[in-house]
A protein has these predicted regions:
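Acidic, surface-exposed loops and disordered segments
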Residues: 1-241
Length: 241
């Protein structure tokens, strides 16, 4: 399928065929394709939980208010954010960045580029992503507003702003996963209606992660898609300047 065909094929499917199982390895491959999605500063602060155990799926369905999509799902994938891992991920990104500079940059420019990478990932990232009862976010906000009086600067740096950044990055991975599933001939239904505490309990998730999306997966039944696709007029959403 072309990209346009994949996009048109992807729908939020509410009812899956119980007679058509999914190949778990294909679903796993679609999750691996999701790792190709871009994330802010390449920190990749998300994880995916691929659930095939029927007992756990029943618990997840209950946590998702027993919607038909989860009750009829063949498998369920849960995407979560892991903002608390920013230090470990920044360290890994920095290490690879330094090695890449050594491999591909001219010798006379390596020191300067390594210093720049180190400043960003070892100093700036920890400062931007650190949390402490909203206080660090307030400090960053005040600094940003002050600097912004003299030059352009990113102003969305509060703790709640950074939480949004992490969820946006995870959302890009979720969309990539759904499109990969569509290409494979599988269907999904992105859910935001769930009891996050019950989802975390069912998956034994650490307290500091957050649920971004629950995606029941399967192959659609004829009644699985509710109605024709509706989109607002393109002219209302497109602005050319």
């Amino acid at each position: 399928m072309s990209l346009r065909e994949i996009l048109n094929n992807r729908r939020a499917v509410r009812h899956f065929d119980p007679a058509k199982p999914l190949d778990a390895e294909v679903v796993k491959d679609c999750i691996e394709q999701a790792t190709l999605a871009p994330t802010s500063s390449n920190l990749q602060l998300w994880e995916a939980y691929h659930v095939t155990d029927k007992k756990v799926m029943e618990q997840l369905s209950k946590a998702c208010l027993d919607q038909l999509s989860t009750r009829s799902a063949q498998q369920i994938v849960v995407f979560v954010t892991r903002q608390s891992l920013y230090k470990q991920h920044a360290k890994a990104v920095l290490a690879e960045g330094i090695e890449e500079i050594k491999r591909n940059s001219p010798a006379e420019k390596q020191e300067k580029r390594i210093k720049k990478q180190t400043l960003y990932h070892a100093k700036l990232i920890p400062f931007i992503y650190s949390r402490g009862f909203g206080l660090w976010g307030l400090v960053r906000k005040v600094l940003a507003q002050g600097v912004g009086l003299f030059r352009p600067i990113t102003r969305q740096v509060s703790e709640s702003d950074m939480r949004v950044v992490v969820h946006k990055s995870c959302g890009l991975a979720v969309q990539t996963f759904m499109l990969a599933m569509s290409e494979a001939g599988y269907d999904t239904c992105p859910l935001e209606g769930f009891d996050s505490l019950l989802v975390k309990k069912a998956l034994y998730l650490p307290h500091d992660c957050e649920i971004n999306m629950v995606l029941p997966c399967g192959i659609r039944l004829p009644d699985g898609v509710r109605g024709e696709r509706f989109r607002l007029p393109f002219e209302e959403q497109y602005h050319r300047i």
